[in-house]
Amino acid sequence: HLCLLLSDESLPDCPDELKRVPVIVHPRDCVPKEYIRDNIVSNMKLLNDKKWVSKHPIHKGKAILVSAGPFTDYADIKELMNKHKDIKVLCVKHSYPTLLKNGIVPWGCIILDPRPITGVSTHGVVRKELFKKLNPKTRFMVASMTDPSVTEHLIENDCNVWGWHAFTDSLRSEEEQGQQIKNQQVKIMDELGIPKGATLITGGTCAAMRGIGMLHTLGFRDIHLFGFDCCMEEPTKEQMTETTGDLEGGETARPKYFQVTVDNN
C-alpha cells in the first residue's frame, strides 16, 4: 500500500497510475461446503469407476478451449480446425449449444456447476436448456462436485460421461482448510469416497478456467482460447443496478460491475 502526502500546493498531482488499485480475487464456492460434499458422495455412486480423468504425459496435440463470451469468433475456430485436423475442442456448458448451432461438435464439454439443472445459470439461462441437444460424439467431463441432477440427465440420455475431481477446500477436513499445501499432497475427507492418489484439477472458480487445468492434465501444452471475454465497453443502466454478494450470509450488496483500467506497459 502506498501513502502519499502533498504539503506544497505548487506540486503537481500524483500520476494516475499510482491511484489505481489492483483487482484482487478471493475465490469461494457458490454453495455451502456441505452441499458440495453431498454432491461428491452421490456422483461417486453415479459415475463409472473406470471413466475418470487422470494425468497424461505431455504430447504435441493441440486443443481449443471455448468459453461463453459474446465475441467468440467461430470462423477462427473453424479455420484452426481445418488447419489442424486432429485438434480437440473443449467447451463449457454455456458455449456447447452455440458451438453446435455453428456446426462445431465439441470433443469435450467440461461441467463444474454444483447447482441443480433446473436452476437459472449466471448467464440467465435455465441449465437444462443448455443440454437440450446432445451430440453422442461429445465427452461430458463432469466434476464430482456437480449437482447429481446434471449427471443423471446426461446418463439418461446415453451421453459419454467422464468424471473428474476439482480441487477445492471443501474436500479437506475442517482443520486442514486454508492451510498451505505441502509436497503437492492434500488429505481428502475419507467420507467423500475419493480414492487415495486421485487426480485433482486446480484452476479458477469457473469451468472455463478449470478447462485450462483439465487440458494441461491431459498432456496438452498448445491450447487456443476463445470466448474468454470478461469486459464490456459500458454496462447498461439496468446492469448498473445489479449487485452481488452473499446477502444471506451477512454480506453487504456490492455493484456487480466495476470499471477497470489496463496498463499498456
Where are these regions (language model features)?
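Metal-ion/cofactor- or nucleotide/acyl-coenzyme-handling active-site neighborhoods
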Residues: H1-N265
